[in-house]
Regions:
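Carbohydrate-active catalytic/glycan-binding domains of CAZyme proteins
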Residues: 1-280
């Protein structure tokens, strides 16, 4: 495919390579939003929003594949969808499975998928699914972290287990403040440290990016770890604040470990045509 540029203003002749840009069509083009890529035995697998999956052996030629999550998401997620994110403003599960990330768990000997199930007004939940093969079927394990809760519905989450009496009798107003910890439980990014610890970052916009420790035996939250309440730094439920907040953009956190350093990548702006979407 060839693209050309033109102008109504008088111009001088430009070299051909300045006026024509070649854009060869990508072979096997497959559109996947919020992609997470993982390699196993020489094959690369991509998982994305709305349960899109593809694989490749050369990172150029891709083919889609199906599993029970793509074919029948309600069979895996119907229970948690009805219990938390589903609302009149947001009635369909199919369009609300967002931004999965997949990691191998050495202790469980399973592939672990952390998937966001999105709801209206931040009433979302990140759940864990496991599989023996990346191109196989998935098993639902349970919720990892909730958002969008208040005093009226907090009993339907694991917040009371984490906060204890505070969830029933304490002040939960910080979880309703866009300048504090009113985050959206989406965009999970699990990481494995060199010494075997598992952590997961998550969050989006407004309240910033947070992370807490996972239990490698279950793949879920490590309930034995407690976090203090320190404004702008730590929260008993959401763990440790990593970045962002103050009603600013910032989502899709991702970590890369190189030469003893951890590097955090985040998306800024918004995804509209004029949103200035960028990764820093």
């Amino acid at each position: 495919m060839t693209a050309t540029t033109s102008t109504t203003e008088p111009t001088t002749e430009s070299p051909a390579d300045e006026r024509f840009v070649e854009h060869p069509l990508a072979p096997g083009r497959i559109a996947i939003h919020d992609p997470a890529i993982v390699e196993d035995n020489g094959t690369y697998y991509v998982f994305g929003t709305h349960r899109r999956c593809a694989r490749s052996t050369d990172l150029v030629h891709w083919e889609r594949f199906e599993n029970n999550l793509t074919r029948d998401p309600a069979s895996l997620l119907g229970g948690i969808w009805e219990a938390w994110p589903k609302q009149p403003e947001n009635p369909a599960l199919e369009g609300n499975t967002w931004a999965p990330d997949v990691i191998w768990n050495d202790v469980m000997r399973k592939w672990c998928m952390y998937l966001s199930v999105n709801g209206h007004e931040f009433r979302s939940v990140i759940v864990l699914l496991t599989a023996d093969r990346l191109d196989g079927d998935w098993t639902y394990v349970g919720p990892v972290v909730y958002s969008g809760f208040n005093v009226d519905n907090v009993g339907r989450t694991d917040v009371p287990r984490v906060l204890g009496d505070e969830a029933a009798h304490g002040d939960l107003s910080r979880y309703a403040s866009l300048k504090d910890t009113r985050i959206n439980a989406i965009d999970a990014a699990p990481i494995r440290c060199d010494h075997g610890e598992l952590w997961m970052s998550f969050g989006s916009w407004f309240g910033g990016i947070w992370m807490f420790k996972l239990d490698p035996k279950t793949g879920l939250r490590d309930y034995s770890v407690r976090y203090p309440l320190v404004h702008d730094s730590a929260d008993p439920y959401y763990g440790v604040k990593v970045a962002g907040g103050y009603w600013n953009s910032g989502e899709g956190s991702y970590f890369v470990h190189r030469n003893g350093w951890w590097y955090l990548f985040m998306a800024y702006g918004w995804l509209g045509r004029t949103g200035g979407y960028q990764i820093r």
